[in-house]
Curated annotation (Swiss-Prot):
This is Chaperone protein TorD. SUPFAM superfamilies: TorD-like. One of its GO terms (cellular component) is cytoplasm. The keyword Transmembrane does not apply. GO terms for biological process: protein complex oligomerization; protein folding. It holds the Pfam family Nitrate_red_del. Keywords: Chaperone, Cytoplasm. It comes from Shigella boydii serotype 18 (strain CDC 3083-94 / BS512). It is found in: Cytoplasm. The keyword Chaperone applies. It comes from the Bacteria.
Length: 199
């Protein structure tokens, strides 16, 4: 990626982690449809590989603003996709895709991080990977830890995530009838792919 700074990429990962970790509340719903968010999306679209995914997400948000009981409908989508059985869902856990759930714990230890007691989900939840990537990108921008060390850990995290993210995104597309979380997962997929190629 060329136009986005390490801090901007960190912010995108942190934002996506938040959206995949819990249902949207009224404040978040208002925020994603705000002018400030539209500016942020414009910035993301300046990165050509992200443009189509951001456009799709913006279309979903526009549709969302005219949807009756949008928050309740999105909460139902979130619950159906991420909290139910894996039969018709896109469970946001590495272990649901036959990946080593201990890998993220090792990566967190290597980064000097641990999961928060406030987050009542297993450590292999998608949001934990995204928080770690956000932390690593912020660290790259600060320059306090050798960049080579951070970059090595970033690549390991991206590789571990890429083992199951495409299947997760495909399941979001298959089972999210409204499409908001499908669009989010597509943006994440493209972001991770670009980040992974940016060695």
């Amino acid at each position: 990626m060329t136009t986005l700074t390490a801090q901007q990429i960190a912010c995108v990962y942190a934002w996506l982690a938040q959206l995949f970790s819990r249902e949207l509340d009224d404040e978040q719903l208002t925020q994603i449809a705000s002018a400030q968010m539209a500016e942020w999306f414009s910035l993301l679209k300046s990165e050509p590989p992200l443009a189509a995914a951001v456009n799709e997400l913006e279309n979903c948000i526009a549709t969302l603003t005219v949807r009756d009981d949008a928050r309740l409908e999105l909460a139902a989508d979130f619950c159906g996709l991420f909290l139910m059985t894996d039969k018709q869902a896109a469970l946001p856990y590495a272990s649901a895709y036959k990946q080593d759930e201990q890998e993220i714990k090792r990566l967190l230890v290597e980064a000097g991080m641990e999961t928060s007691g406030n987050f009542n989900e297993p450590a292999d939840h998608l949001a934990i990977y995204l928080e770690l990537l956000s932390h690593l990108h912020f660290s790259l921008g600060e320059g306090t830890v050798p960049a080579r060390r951070i970059d090595s850990l970033r690549q390991k995290t991206l590789t571990a995530l890429w083992q199951w993210l495409p299947e997760f995104a495909a399941r979001c597309h298959q089972y999210d009838s409204f499409g908001f979380y499908a669009a989010l997962s597509q943006l994440l997929l493209v972001l991770v792919e670009c980040d992974h190629q940016n060695k």
